[in-house]
């Protein structure tokens, strides 16, 4: 039997499709999301409706974003969900979540079992809309969740950690084995909750500068920042900020990256390349 076929649908590798089918895991995720009537609930990649059905049962209206034309068509004719659903058959990577929040008149509660092949770039896309989002619950590759929650001085800590924690409070929810999916992925999975900060703990003047600094630092993570960021900061400037130039990218805290970004924004304003 082809284990890529589930409920009559052939999982498509190009969309990174792995369908959740473990009822205990599904119930645990829905409990963590805790959807309530009247909230602007949005699901990314509903697939075969493993989460859509139990979430939709609790709601009068649910918005879903599904790239796969066949799956979007299945949802339109769903026996009890169909009338409740607003379906956008498009790519979440280019979706305007700000416009949707404005249309719905409130911040969005976003959730989904994200395709692992686009999960990291999709997270960065969503971070640009955190002022329009109340919270997010996602099933991701466990390694990605580890990176999201990692602190300084750990191997998992990287640019994704810094940017996620700049925008959100990041909370791991539960771990999920490959056996919970059809077809089973080759990696472990985990669910994470991301809640955008109501008040930024480390505000930056220009987030593009923070993005640039973290990109340059972590692209050369084995180098000391004296070398990896030497084109942006002198040793004297780093020392003046209380940052040891002999540290590496993984040793610098989110607060320190934000401090560096604000210095650079004030002294060398961002130029579009």
Swiss-Prot record:
Documented EC number(s): 2.1.1.182
Residues making up the signal peptide according to the UniProt record: none
Positions contributing to S-adenosyl-L-methionine binding: 18, 20, 45, 66, 91, 113
GO molecular function, one term: RNA binding
Example of a GO cellular component annotation carried by this entry: cytosol
Tree of life domain: Bacteria
Protein name as annotated: Ribosomal RNA small subunit methyltransferase A
Biological source species: Escherichia coli O157:H7
């Amino acid at each position: 039997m082809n284990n890529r076929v589930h409920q009559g649908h052939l999982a498509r590798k190009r969309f990174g499709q792995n369908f959740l089918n473990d009822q205990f895991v599904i119930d645990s995720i829905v409990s963590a999301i805790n959807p309530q009537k009247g909230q602007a609930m949005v699901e990314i990649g509903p697939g075969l409706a493993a989460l859509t059905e139990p979430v939709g049962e609790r709601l009068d209206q649910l918005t879903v974003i599904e790239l796969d034309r066949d799956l979007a068509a299945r949802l339109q004719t769903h026996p009890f969900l169909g009338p409740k659903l607003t379906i956008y058959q498009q790519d979440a990577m280019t979706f305007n979540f700000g416009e949707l929040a404005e249309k719905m008149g409130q911040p969005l509660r976003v959730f989904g079992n994200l395709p692992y092949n686009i999960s990291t770039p999709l997270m960065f896309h969503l971070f640009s809309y955190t002022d329009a989002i109340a919270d997010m619950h996602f099933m991701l590759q466990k390694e990605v969740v580890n990176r999201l929650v990692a602190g300084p001085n750990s191997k998992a800590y990287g640019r994704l950690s810094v940017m996620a924690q700049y925008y959100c409070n990041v909370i791991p929810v539960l771990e999920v084995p490959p056996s919970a999916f059809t077809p089973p992925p080759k990696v472990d999975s985990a669910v994470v909750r991301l809640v955008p900060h109501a008040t930024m703990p480390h505000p930056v003047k220009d987030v593009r500068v923070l993005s640039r600094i973290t990109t340059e630092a972590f692209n050369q993570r084995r180098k000391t920042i004296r070398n990896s960021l030497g084109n942006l900061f002198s040793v004297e400037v780093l020392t003046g900020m209380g940052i040891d130039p002999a540290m590496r990218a993984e040793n610098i805290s989110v607060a320190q990256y934000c401090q560096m970004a604000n210095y650079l924004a004030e002294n060398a304003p961002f130029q579009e390349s």
